[in-house]
Amino acid sequence: MQVFTLFSKFKKALTRAILAFIATIIVCTPAQAAEVVNGKLHLRFAIAPMRPTPSQTIKEFEPIFKYLADQLGATYEIVSPESWAAISVAMTNGHVDVGWLGPWGYVLSNKKAGTEVLATVKYRGEPFYKALIVGRADLPIKKWPEDAKGLKLSLSDQGNTSGWLIPMAYFKSIGIDPASYFEYREGATFGQNESQIQHGLIDLGSDMDRGRNGMIEAGQIDPSKSKIVWESSKLPNDAISVPKDFDPALKARITEILTSLSEEKAQSLMGSGYNGFVKAKHSDYKVIEDAGRILGKL
């Protein structure tokens, strides 16, 4: 009986020791430690759909991620989903180490999973851009939005900042429900919106100034076949983001590498017009949070 009692006490003590050891490992191990493969840091990169197709996006923007990986002595993999919402979900679910997220995608991921912004992308020297509503060139719109009532309007997916969030917040602020005011649809990419306008399949579609400029410069759309009928005020540009509890030293190094690039060097590594990064903090995206609250999404 005494032997059994001693064994029982030893077993309980051993169990407590094991549980304490496991707890120590959980506390001391970073929640988002970067993966190491064959002795080298391995990073999972993801970039929002900057161009009409994922292959075009990766072709134009992979060089900046390769540069970052090379500077860190890391290997990498890179993906570009077809929707702005998808990359936010991937970041939120822990499938991305460093993500180029749209402003709204970043805010949503921050709200759900504590995602942190390190830097804001510069476009033509500024960390800002504008949301657009583009229309067919022949539309007789003199007074907006009154003259557009009943027209075919296409917005982007609900994870898209300039393609959905900002136009929807604008319409709500002036008392318009797009679903009843227009012949309304949503979920298209910017490239699809611009293409359908070019071919007369829709009357109006959302876009962003930098995306439209890029498609014009690449010869993908004819600017004479469309016109801008509405634009937003300046919005904070895309967010270079990492998961909550990402390695602090690695965060600092990534921020330093990106923000120290000259505009000339940065432009050589990215799509047309994109030429650098500036340090960022969450409060820089307050205007995006405000729009989300207007629509009851936060």
UniProtKB/Swiss-Prot annotation:
Keyword Transport: yes
InterPro entries: PhnD (IPR005770)
TM segment ranges: none
GO cellular component, one term: ATP-binding cassette (ABC) transporter complex
Keyword ATP-binding: no
Entries under CDD domains matching the protein: PBP2_PhnD_like (cd01071)
Span of the signal peptide: 1-33
Pfam families linked: Phosphonate-bd (PF12974)
Keywords: Signal, Transport
GO biological process: transmembrane transport
Function statement: Probably forms part of a binding-protein-dependent hypophosphite transporter.
Similarity section: Belongs to the phosphate/phosphite/phosphonate binding protein family.
Protein's recorded name: Probable phosphite transport system-binding protein HtxB
Organism field: Stutzerimonas stutzeri
Lineage: Bacteria, Pseudomonadati, Pseudomonadota, Gammaproteobacteria, Pseudomonadales
Gene: htxB
